[in-house]
Amino acid sequence: MNRIACTVHGRVQGVGFRYWTKRKAAALGLRGWVKNAPDGTVMLEAAGEAGLWMSLPGRCTAGLPSAP
């Protein structure tokens, strides 16, 4: 099992980003956590098979489908 940790910058608080990220990670079979940081970013850590978690950063970069 491998692990990834990252910090996401931009408009990520108050827009449902944590909930969306948690759902995407669960759909990939990943386990972990997502939380708001005091500086306005969102921090996340996910663990699972390498082939699964490698797609998570790209999905986070793409963002919510409803994002402008």
Curated annotation (Swiss-Prot):
Superkingdom in the source lineage: Bacteria
Keyword Hydrolase set for record: yes
GO molecular function terms attached to this record: acylphosphatase activity
Sorted UniProt keywords: Hydrolase
UniProt entry tagged with the keyword Metal-binding: no
Family: Belongs to the acylphosphatase family.
Protein name (database record): Acylphosphatase
Source organism: Oleidesulfovibrio alaskensis (strain ATCC BAA-1058 / DSM 17464 / G20) (Desulfovibrio alaskensis)
Gene: acyP
